[in-house]
Amino acid sequence: MGRFRGGLRCIKYLLLGFNLLFWLAGSAVIAFGLWFRFGGTMKDLSSEDKSPEYFYVGLYVLVGAGALMMTVGFFGCCGAMRESQCVLGSFFTCLLVIFAAEVTTGVFAFIGKDVAIRHVQSMYEEAYSDYLKDRARGNGTLITFHSAFQCCGKESSEQVQPTCPKELPGHKNCIDKIETVISAKLQLIGIVGIGIAGLTIFGMIFSMVLCCAIRNSRDVI
């Protein structure tokens, strides 16, 4: 009996440790998602009328999952401390929802990468054409693109040189740079989503083991 209670206590502390880690991971995911959405390249693009909302869907899911992770981490600690089967069962269900959300984010980021790249490239092509037709009307949008992606023009930068960043060393094709930047960012989002999903699996295992151990201990008593 003493050995059984010792094992139960060990599982409980493992779950408590997991929930602390899970809460911190949730905070990091929210910070990561908000920084990705409102910082740097994406901050510049979001100010445009035709901002790439398709690109942001995965980030919205990621931030929502991060908020849920923080909440679930807190209730998971409560369930482990109180040894409540009901709370642990709810905790397991929430982890399952988070797992599905993170896998969706990861898959969406990897599969939707080409669509997002083409969408942003078409936005640039349109801004480029507008500038050549009316330099006053298309000036602001093109400057935003060149500043966000640190590039200038397409095959040549001569026609759009006034909109290029002054600190940019040499010519950099914006079509190629957009593909490189968006691909890298979406790949990072996908890796974070899949990584959190993997962490969630351990939480589901710990919660089920503890729930079964609590039930068995009460049966013994």
Swiss-Prot record:
Q: How does it sit in the membrane?
A: Multi-pass membrane protein
Q: Name one Pfam family in it.
A: Tetraspanin
Q: Which InterPro entries match?
A: Tetraspanin/Peripherin, Tetraspanin_animals, Tetraspanin_CS, Tetraspanin_EC2_sf
Q: Which residues lie on this side of the membrane: Cytoplasmic?
A: 1-13, 76-90, 210-221
Kindly list the places in or outside the cell where this protein is found, as annotated in its UniProt entry. Answer: Membrane
Which keywords does this Swiss-Prot/TrEMBL entry list?
A: Glycoprotein, Membrane, Transmembrane, Transmembrane helix
Please state which protein family the record places this protein in. Answer: Belongs to the tetraspanin (TM4SF) family.
Task: Identify this protein by name.
Answer: Tetraspanin-2
Gene name? Tspan2
